[in-house]
Regions:
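Sec-dependent N-terminal signal peptides
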Residues: 4-15
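Short glycine/proline- and aromatic-enriched beta-strand/turn motifs that initiate or cap beta-hairpins
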Residues: 18-67
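Transmembrane beta-barrel strands of outer-membrane/channel proteins
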Residues: 24-28, 60-64, 93-95, 128-134, ...
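Solvent-exposed loop/turn segments connecting transmembrane beta-strands
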Residues: 37-41, 65-73, 99-107, 135-147, ...
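Membrane-embedded beta-strands of outer-membrane beta-barrel proteins
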Residues: 47, 76-78, 111-113, 150-152, ...
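Repeated loop/turn-to-beta-strand initiation elements of outer-membrane beta-barrel proteins
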Residues: 55-59, 84-91, 119-126, 156-165, ...
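Outer-membrane beta-barrel transmembrane domain signature
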Residues: 133-200, 206-212, 231-233
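Outer-membrane beta-barrel "beta-signal"
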Residues: 221-233
Length: 233
């Protein structure tokens, strides 16, 4: 459930040649913040795919948010990395954007560098990305502006691969309505119990500051947990 205001990034970086999964999450955010997040969708379907090749790797995810009557929105992030040498460094390019039933997300393009690594058995993986980020003008009341983004991604399998802990953390410069900058923080750790090699049950917790669009009051920090299932192809 990675956004519907936004978001950047992500992922369960699976350091294999090919990995794909689909997730279904029930979000408790609206139950916790009934005023500030009164319009937050409760159900999100996520599709993720990672594919490595001889030049580097592709990664994308798509989040689709549902209400009882509508498909509320769809948000995607698509990235490509090109390996630089054999020490884990890579060039990183990315596109973020999406649509809702009434509008669209402000699109952005990112370019920068990544440092990726893993343990010998691939049970531990990590990626650190530092990128220039450009937001494109979306509406008459929005502005194109320059930004940056620092992203960390991790994956950890433990308990004889019966459990997985993965997620990402993003730091980027957002822009307020008055044009002043602000630091946006978003992290979405996931904890899964792997019932089989393909089926998992678990949770994702979206923790953010200056990320949720809140017109009810001046609250900026939110913790939104989910209950989810995942199928690994």
């Amino acid at each position: 459930m990675k956004k519907f205001f936004f978001l950047a990034l992500m992922a369960v970086v699976a350091m294999s040649t090919h990995a794909q999964n689909v997730q279904l999450h029930y979000d408790f955010g609206r139950n916790i913040y009934s005023n500030e997040e009164a319009g937050r969708p409760k159900v999100t379907l996520t599709l993720e795919q990672f594919k490595a090749d001889k030049w580097g790797s592709w990664f994308y995810f798509v989040d689709v948010d549902f209400s009882r009557k509508f498909t509320e929105s769809a948000y995607t992030e698509i990235s490509r990395e090109f390996n630089i040498g054999n020490k884990g460094f890579a060039a990183h390019v990315e596109y973020d954007g999406g649509l809702s039933k009434t509008s669209s997300f402000q699109q952005s393009a990112l370019i920068g560098a990544a440092w990726n690594g893993h343990s010998a058995d691939f049970s531990k993986t990590y990626s650190v990305q530092l990128m220039y980020k450009h937001y494109f003008k979306a509406y008459d009341y929005s502005n194109a502006y320059h930004s940056f983004q620092l992203t960390g991604v991790w994956g950890l399998n433990f308990a004889d691969n019966k459990c997985s802990f993965s997620g990402f953390v993003d730091f980027w410069r957002g822009e307020k309505g008055n044009g002043h900058g602000e630091l946006v923080i978003l992290t979405e750790p996931q904890l899964w119990y792997n019932v089989t090699d393909h089926f998992s049950i678990g949770t994702e917790v979206e923790i953010s500051n200056n990320f949720v669009y809140n017109v009810y009051n001046d609250k900026k920090f939110f913790v939104n947990p989910t209950l989810g299932v995942k199928w690994n192809f």
